[in-house]
């Protein structure tokens, strides 16, 4: 709960205009709202503060034809017209809205990042929007100025870097090297040290991390569960448990993590109801998992509705159950 009240709560979203060059560049003609919460008691309205709590907000929006949903953001506009990009925001296609978590009520709008590299290898890929999502938020970079390499394997060093950036880790806080195979000047070095120190990922031995080794899908599940747990996130059980056709091939140490991440809607199966536990986790799959994680943190119910599995195939979930056959109202 946001707060203890004895009256009715009303969330007000008032369209507003903010004039500054920074707002014009970030938001343009997209919606901007002054968002407030009020308690109504005995006919009197009183403004409500979050007082250290958070609230999930959705701003309805239909992307323009030239806009990529993965590049849409929620932005906060302060009293001086300065824009703060909210990295933990996402355009949810099922809700047709930009969703985000607010720590205070204020002026919020919808921003768009135009400066995303024009990758030549993502246009026809099922995870295109997810890849643009992670790049626009600085979680992952392209493999060149024009390529993302969606089907290339995700290395341990790359993965912990993305997670560290998502967590807002300050690299200067983790400069002391913990592993002999992690060079101090490697881009992933501080994030490896952070991940090992916090228990998100262990080394392959006491002195090695194997940063250039690809992770497989069951390892990705374990790391994501560790990440959520260590950072204090609640892992929801939104979806029914899936009995994958290859469940017997999931390692005993990964079974609980696979189940947990699948029920939360963070990881999914692939073609023919397989999980492919030993298959290499690709950059496209990791981008998809990171975006799902952000959306689940904002609103666990984003696991319902139309969703793609980890092969890009669409399914529909209602109240946590997979809907089979024709859909009707």
Placement of each model-derived feature along the sequence:
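Long, contiguous ectodomains of secretory-pathway proteins
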Residues: 1-84, 103-104
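Surface-exposed loop/edge segments in extracytoplasmic proteins
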Residues: 81-88, 323
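Short strand-edge motifs at loop-to-beta-strand transitions and within beta-strands
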Residues: 96-98
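Feature responds to low-complexity, polar/acidic, surface-exposed segments characteristic
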Residues: 103-128, 136, 141-157, 164-190, ...
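A short amphipathic alpha-helical interaction element
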Residues: 131-134, 159-163, 195, 224, ...
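Extracellular beta-strand-rich, repetitive "passenger/adhesive" scaffolds
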Residues: 318-321
């Amino acid at each position: 709960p946001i707060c203890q009240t004895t009256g009715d709560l009303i969330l007000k979203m008032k369209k507003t205009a903010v004039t500054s060059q920074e707002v014009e560049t970030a938001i343009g003609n997209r919606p901007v709202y002054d968002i407030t919460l009020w308690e109504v008691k005995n006919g009197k309205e009183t403004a409500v503060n979050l007082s250290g709590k958070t609230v999930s907000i959705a701003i309805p929006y239909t992307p323009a034809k030239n806009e990529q949903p993965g590049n849409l953001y929620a932005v906060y506009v302060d009293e001086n017209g300065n824009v703060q990009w909210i990295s933990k925001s996402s355009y949810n296609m099922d809700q047709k809205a930009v969703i985000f978590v607010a720590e205070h009520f204020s002026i919020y709008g919808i921003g768009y990042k135009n400066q995303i590299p024009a990758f030549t290898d993502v246009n026809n890929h099922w995870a295109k929007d997810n890849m643009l999502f992670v790049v626009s938020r600085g979680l992952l970079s392209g493999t060149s100025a024009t390529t993302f390499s969606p089907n290339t394997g995700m290395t341990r060093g790359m993965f912990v870097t993305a997670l560290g950036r998502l967590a807002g880790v300050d690299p200067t806080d983790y400069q002391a090297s913990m592993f002999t195979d992690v060079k101090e000047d490697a881009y992933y070095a501080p994030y490896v040290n952070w991940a090992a120190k916090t228990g998100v990922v262990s080394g392959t031995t006491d002195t090695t991390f194997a940063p250039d080794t690809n992770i497989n899908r069951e390892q990705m599940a374990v790391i994501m569960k560790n990440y959520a747990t260590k950072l204090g996130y609640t892992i929801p059980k939104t979806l029914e448990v899936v009995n994958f056709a290859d469940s017997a091939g999931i390692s005993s140490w990964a079974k609980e993590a696979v189940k947990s991440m699948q029920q939360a809607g963070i990881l999914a199966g692939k073609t023919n109801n397989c999980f492919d536990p030993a298959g290499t986790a690709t950059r496209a799959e990791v981008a998809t998992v990171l975006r799902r994680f952000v959306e689940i943190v904002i609103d666990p119910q984003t696991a319902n509705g139309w969703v793609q599995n980890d092969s890009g195939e669409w399914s529909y979930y209602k109240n946590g159950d997979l809907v089979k056959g024709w859909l009707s109202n």
